[in-house]
């Protein structure tokens, strides 16, 4: 990951979390994983037959050596009946049976000296978008929150593009954060090309409002989708369409060239939108965004027409991108061919991950974790073991035997 991005994140955002909660980000994540292991490390049948295993004692669950950090962690994660009641009965635009915000904030319910996870999924979410909101809720000023949104967006872009580069490695040409030759401004977040087919990637880490997702009211959802991801001035679809018409202008004398990449013989450009929220990449919202992109491209072409084909917009999320990287450990996988095949299917109500599963079956590709992913997971658990037990995971396993 780019050093300047991590430095900015360390200096600004991590300082907020450490100062106001007493925990560093890696420490907070380790405690979340440690508590989550109690549930995912067991057979569901065992939890159903022995309900007491579902309860944790906040005072003793983590080792005594990390007591202060454990208290800080539980201070963020424990919810009470009174707190839940206040939040769940507050007047909002959310449909009550979709309103789990209180449980997402504090996924452990305090009960007479012990606690119970409302649902392990709420704990797991703290390792994803929940981390953002945990940091967000520690911030006190709009300037701090704005800084967090900008930095989180840049981190998301950087992570996705690095992962896509790994998914494309060994085949075709992938250019991260390509810039226009005339002014050195960024054109797309990433470009993949074989000289004839080009894939243009745009990443968007924005969050939809809770009322947009959970009110069951299209009048709230659609404007929010358009504003953050669609054809608004800062919307991702408008950016993609505008840059496509500039790079592939039918009037070749007015084309804007990408530095370090020859696209003069490209006859097909595939637009890809990578989002953070699964809600945005879900089949119905992806279909809406694909249709919205088609309309936006038509408007842009009235000003600058293009001389290449532009099939359907493909919408995917971070989970899909990680699956694409794993797929590239198989020699039969080709990222450009994969997304081109999905784009050729048109604006269908078809989840990208479902498509990828079908595509992998046809190509004989495994979507299971590979050695790279296994190595990263092992490194995380080694770090957790050192934090809580001051020894490697292998030593813990030997003692258990």
Which ranges hold each PLM region?
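Active-site beta-strand-loop-beta-strand hairpin of nuclease catalytic cores
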Residues: 192-211
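A short acidic (Asp/Glu
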Residues: 186-188, 278-287
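Short, internal active-site loops enriched in acidic
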Residues: 267-268, 274-281
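Catalytic cores of nucleic-acid endonucleases
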Residues: 205-270
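A short acidic/basic microdomain associated with nuclease active sites
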Residues: 166-193
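Conserved structured core elements
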Residues: 150, 154-158, 181-184, 234-241, ...
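Interfaces and regulatory segments of ATP-dependent nucleotide/adenylate/phosphodiester-chemistry enzymes
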Residues: 1-167, 288-401
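Short secondary-structure boundary/capping segments
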Residues: 215-219, 285-293
């Amino acid at each position: 990951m780019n050093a300047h991005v991590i430095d900015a994140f360390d200096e600004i955002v991590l300082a907020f979390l450490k100062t106001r909660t007493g925990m560093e980000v890696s420490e907070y994540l380790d405690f979340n994983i440690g508590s989550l292991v109690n549930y995912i490390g067991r057979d569901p049948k065992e939890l159903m037959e022995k309900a007491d295993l579902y309860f944790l004692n906040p005072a003793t669950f983590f080792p005594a050596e990390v007591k202060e950090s454990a208290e800080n962690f539980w201070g963020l994660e424990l919810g009470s009946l009174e707190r839940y009641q206040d939040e769940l009965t507050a007047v909002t635009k959310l449909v009550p049976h979709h309103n789990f915000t209180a449980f997402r904030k504090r996924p452990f319910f305090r009960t007479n000296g012990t606690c119970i996870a409302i649902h392990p999924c709420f704990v797991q979410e703290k390792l994803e978008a929940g981390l953002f909101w945990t940091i967000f809720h520690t911030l006190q000023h709009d300037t701090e929150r704005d800084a967090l949104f900008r930095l989180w967006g840049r981190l998301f872009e950087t992570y996705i593009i690095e992962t896509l580069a790994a998914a494309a490695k060994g085949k075709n040409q992938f250019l991260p954060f390509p810039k226009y030759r005339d002014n050195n401004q960024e054109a797309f977040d990433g470009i993949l090309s074989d000289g004839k087919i080009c894939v243009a990637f745009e990443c968007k880490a924005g969050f939809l409002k809770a009322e947009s997702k959970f009110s069951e009211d299209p009048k709230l959802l659609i404007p929010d989708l358009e504003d953050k991801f669609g054809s608004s001035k800062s919307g991702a679809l408008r950016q993609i369409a505008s840059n496509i018409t500039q790079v592939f202008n039918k009037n070749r004398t007015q084309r804007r060239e990408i530095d370090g990449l020859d696209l003069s013989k490209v006859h097909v450009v595939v637009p890809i939108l990578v989002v953070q929220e699964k809600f945005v990449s879900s089949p119905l919202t992806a279909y809406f965004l694909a249709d919205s992109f088609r309309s936006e491209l038509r408007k842009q072409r009235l000003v600058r027409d293009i001389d290449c084909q532009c099939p359907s917009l493909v919408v995917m999320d971070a989970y899909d991108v990680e699956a694409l990287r794993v797929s590239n450990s198989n020699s039969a996988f080709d990222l450009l061919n994969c997304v081109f095949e999905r784009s050729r299917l048109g604006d269908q109500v078809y989840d990208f991950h479902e498509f990828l599963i079908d595509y992998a079956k046809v190509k004989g590709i495994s979507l299971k974790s590979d050695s790279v992913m296994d190595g990263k997971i092992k490194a995380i658990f080694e770090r957790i073991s050192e934090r809580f037990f001051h020894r490697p995971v292998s030593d813990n396993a030997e003692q258990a035997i």
